[in-house]
Amino acid sequence: MENIEKLLMQEKILMLELDLVRAKISLARANGSSQQGDLSLHRETPVKEEAVHSALATFTPTQVKAIPEQTAPGKESTNPLMASILPKDMNPVQTGIRLAVPGDFLRPHQGIPIPQKSELSSTVVPLRDESGIQHPHINYYVVYNGPHAGIYDDWGCTKAATNGVPGVAHKKFATITEARAAADAYTTSQQTDRLNFIPKGEAQLKPKSFREALTSPPKQKAHWLTLGTKRPSSDPAPKEISFAPEITMDDFLYLYDLGRKFDGEGDDTMFTTDNEKISLFNFRKNADPQMVREAYAAGLIKTIYPSNNLQEIKYLPKKVKDAVKRFRTNCIKNTEKDIFLKIRSTIPVWTIQGLLHKPRQVIEIGVSKKVVPTESKAMESKIQIEDLTELAVKTGEQFIQSLLRLNDKKKIFVNMVEDDTLVYSKNIKDTVSEDQRAIETFQQRVISGNLLGFHCPAICHFIERTVEKEGGSYKVHHCDKGKAIVQDASADSGPKDGPPPTRSIVEKEDVPTTSSKQVD
């Protein structure tokens, strides 16, 4: 049935075309010129074209009716008995933009050729100019000096190699050739070793200490010999740095000199409080956590003003950090307020065998107002190794004074107490009995002639004088003023387990001391 409908549709179309041809012939005869008639056969007026297209558009298969057969001769029409209706005998029909042959209606896709997919070849021209495509560009950075001097291909490694280290020069280059030429020119002029190229994955930028970051030479890459096992890509970093490493005398002297010579230029993350004998650090926001840790271990910190994320104190002892976090969350309403850590500390004491005494701290936590830094002044540093014990006694006396002043404060909350550290904050309520006992226990354990790890008569007599002023009593057996001064320090070997003796500090005999304290 579908084929019959298609044939009937073709028949209707041909009849319309035939009527159009007849109209053209009549028009040509009326003009009286056969030549003009031939030309007019190839011209179609817009009016006639619109008539044909409108007729085709409104035509539907339901309107098709059978045409009666024509048997009379002489009429200008096709003979239905002749085989002139075959597709090969039909003329092409213009049905749109494409010239369609009637036979195409019987072919697949109505005779419209479908283009085949062409195979890709290397000669295909790109759709756009390749010069407009942006390719990734690698910059090269030359760190001329410092503990991590070299040529880097990553800005993150370069920043880590230069951040926090004063006096380091670096520059960016577009190519490795320019970077190498600049590095060689610098090393030649300075008569130093040739700088190495350090790829991104091979940079070792974590020095052991802040002091070593400024003084130690760059380390060469370690070559590990493995048999049947894969070399680890990097050493697993610990979650946090423990406080186990002991500070050495060289580290302390370096930090002491740094504080005395610091004038505030080039670093706005810290300032110093300068006294006659010692300069203490005051760390502000964005201070180097590694330096804060080492200054804390050296007993050279007066105040810390940390950020809200407490990144400056992340390397301090864990119990101290936890006490600060609990203060922010439990003791103040607005946790976004700035806080401070005010520290009173002793300094370390060394002997020939090593570290004898670690610093002891009393830390006060509170809400900070606007920080007004004092002017840091470059002070003259004349301290010698033999003067360290005298400086330790001076800081020990100040530590005892700060600890005894807690007796005058009636509203104190103890945040944390350990063998060598007491952390407290102000409270709106009176001190509870539990916190008062914790303070008294800490005072009895710490305040003695052995505060610095060895028996020091100067500390004993200072405690006695201070307690007497407050109305208490402090008794020390076998320790009098006559033995508190050493006239010939060179001839005195000092106590067996104490530091090297200095003038007017340590007695000649290591006498055990028993003490008792009563404070009204």
Curated annotation (Swiss-Prot):
SUPFAM superfamilies: L9 N-domain-like. Keywords: Host cytoplasm, Translation regulation. It is found in: Host cytoplasm. InterPro entries: Ribosomal_bL9/RNase_H1_N, RNase_H1_N, RNase_H1_N_sf. Residues 486-520 are annotated as: Disordered. GO terms for biological process: regulation of translation. Its main location: host cell. Disulfide bonds: none annotated. GO terms for cellular component: host cell cytoplasm. It holds the Pfam family Cauli_VI. The inclusion bodies are the site of viral DNA synthesis, virion assembly and accumulation in the infected cell. Enhances the ribosomal termination-reinitiation event leading to the translation of major open reading frames on the polycistronic viral RNAs. Belongs to the caulimoviridae viroplasmin family. This is Transactivator/viroplasmin protein.
